[in-house]
UniProtKB/Swiss-Prot annotation:
It catalyses: L-threonine + hydrogencarbonate + ATP = L-threonylcarbamoyladenylate + diphosphate + H2O. PROSITE patterns: YRDC (PS51163). It is found in: Cytoplasm. It is an enzyme of class 2 (transferase). Residues 3-188 form the YrdC-like domain. It holds the Pfam family Sua5_yciO_yrdC. It comes from Shewanella denitrificans (strain OS217 / ATCC BAA-1090 / DSM 15013). This is Threonylcarbamoyl-AMP synthase. It comes from the Bacteria.
């Protein structure tokens, strides 16, 4: 497994690779959201059913516009999400119809976050698009908190580890339904 900086890993992602990278609270697994084969590989590594869907992280809301159907949201709903970003808040928003089922699962929505973590932001800026994000762990197990554990648990399963430190969050992000305002998972 390659160990790279956030600026060096772009070609790995562009070629369909799956990476591990530090986020606000835990290590994440990620790939190109427009590459179904990469998403399938990520789901296989994590042993996660496609039906559950995945999260997209971005450095700006503009990067999420190709995926989110903003026409189904009110200005107040968008303003609320923007008031929490960048930061540890994931919003479930209506998804555009062309977005792969492998990414959105069996839902008519997609979970999105504008991250405040500098490495996540660098990754998304270097790709000029969001990154698929899911916690680096096998389904049902605790998320990975150290690069050493990534190297042990995912050595021959992923293509690269992005070097860097986790953020200061103690818990994964809070998840909020953008349409209803309902908190689906408390984080922080």
């Amino acid at each position: 497994m390659l160990q790279l900086s956030s600026t060096q890993v772009t070609p790995v992602i562009a070629q369909g690779g799956v990476i591990a990278y530090p986020t606000e609270a835990v290590y994440g697994l990620g790939c190109d959201p427009d590459n179904d084969q990469a998403i399938e590989k990520l789901l296989a590594v994590k042993q996660r059913p496609w039906q559950k869907g995945l999260i997209l992280v971005a450095s700006s809301f503009e990067q999420l516009l190709p995926y989110v159907d903003v026409a189904q949201l009110t200005q107040a709903q968008l303003d609320f999400a923007h008031s929490k970003w960048p930061g540890p808040f994931t919003f479930v928003m209506p998804v555009k119809s062309h977005v792969s089922n492998k990414l959105r699962g069996e839902f008519d929505s997609i979970a999105v976050r504008v991250s405040a973590h500098p490495i996540v932001r660098e990754l998304c800026d270097s790709l000029n698009k969001p990154l698929v994000s899911t916690s680096a762990n096998l389904a049902g197990q605790d998320p990975v908190l150290t690069s050493r554990q990534i190297l042990t648990d995912f050595a021959d399963k992923i293509d690269a580890l992005v070097l860097g430190d986790l953020g200061q969050q103690a818990q994964p992000s809070t998840i909020i339904d953008a349409r209803s305002g309902l908190v689906l998972r408390n984080g922080q």
